Design a protein with these regions (language model features):
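ABC ATPase C-loop
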Residues: 127, 131, 151-152
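Catalytic Walker B motif of ABC-type/P-loop ATPase nucleotide-binding domains
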Residues: 159-162
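The feature captures the beta-strand-to-loop junction immediately N-terminal to the Walker
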Residues: 37-39
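Short coil-to-helix segment of the ABC ATPase nucleotide-binding domain corresponding to the Q-loop/switch region
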Residues: 98-105
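Helix-to-loop junction immediately C-terminal to a conserved catalytic motif
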Residues: 52
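A short, proline-enriched helix->beta-strand linker immediately N-terminal to the Walker B motif
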Residues: 153-157
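Conserved ABC ATPase signature
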Residues: 134-138, 142-144
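ABC ATPase NBD coupling module
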Residues: 69-85, 225-228
Length: 240
């Protein structure tokens, strides 16, 4: 399996002696769905942000889609990432006053997706015919579908998802995870997802558990009950 994402000895520290990541190494292959879990403060979101180029590691290297990104300047990185990376966040990051179609067109204003591509991806996520509706009129589940569509419309190699179901009920959350799973299985997209929910993590192929900024577990994903037990064990070990 060809690597799409490679982190090597990545560390991230902040002022006042806060260390979020400690020499983390992680390789994610093409078409792989990886869930990242851990106790509060374990470094989950920092790992995702460093992997996506949204934050810079204090040391170590990050290769994304074959390119070393940890030392790229911000503007070239943003341009390079536009057609290769999609993002899905718990807060949706959509503009409520704009229509669904306008939100999907935003990531590619400098030569972005065609209208036909937008309509096709909206149909694929179950939002066919909603392109002219303002996002502010949609339910939470529909907004997250728009966010998934926006992530997919440029044909990315990787989707980074930070708690994509955190604000949704279990049924709607399952539908959103099904869309991510389909992107992996049908389109070969790589997904790196941070979640606190064992049921959400169970949709992945691989589970990475963080403990105090280090990788405690990296293995094939078990069932939700076993994930919950492992997460509890890691969290308890940190509390001691």
């Amino acid at each position: 399996m060809e690597p799409v994402l490679e982190l090597e000895d990545v560390a991230r520290s902040f002022p006042r002696g806060i260390v979020a990541l400690r020499q983390v190494s992680l390789t994610v292959g093409a078409g792989e769905f990886v869930a990242v879990m851990g106790a509060t403060g374990s470094g989950k979101s920092t790992l995702l942000h460093c992997a996506a180029g949204l934050d810079r590691p204090s040391s170590g290297s990050v290769r994304l889609a074959g390119r070393e990104i940890s030392r790229m300047r911000e503007r070239p990185l943003t341009r390079w990432r536009r057609d290769r990376v999609g993002f899905v966040f718990q807060s949706y990051n959509l503009l409520s006053e704009l229509t669904v179609r306008q939100n999907l067109a935003l990531p590619g204003r400098l030569g972005g997706p065609r209208r036909r591509d937008i309509d096709e991806v909206l149909a694929a996520v179950g939002l066919g015919g909603t392109g002219r509706r303002p996002v502010g009129e949609l339910s939470g589940g529909q907004r997250q579908r728009v966010a998934i569509a926006r992530a997919l419309v440029t044909g990315p190699s990787v989707i980074f998802a930070d708690e994509p179901t955190g604000a949704l009920d279990p049924t709607t959350g399952g539908q959103i995870l099904g869309l991510l799973r389909r992107a992996v299985d049908r389109d070969g997209v790589t997904v790196l997802m941070v979640t606190h929910d064992p049921a959400a993590a169970a949709w992945s192929d691989r589970l990475v558990l963080l403990r105090a900024g280090t990788v405690a577990t990296d293995a094939a994903t078990p069932d939700a009950s076993t994930i919950a037990d492992r997460l509890h064990a890691v969290s308890t070990a940190v509390a001691r």
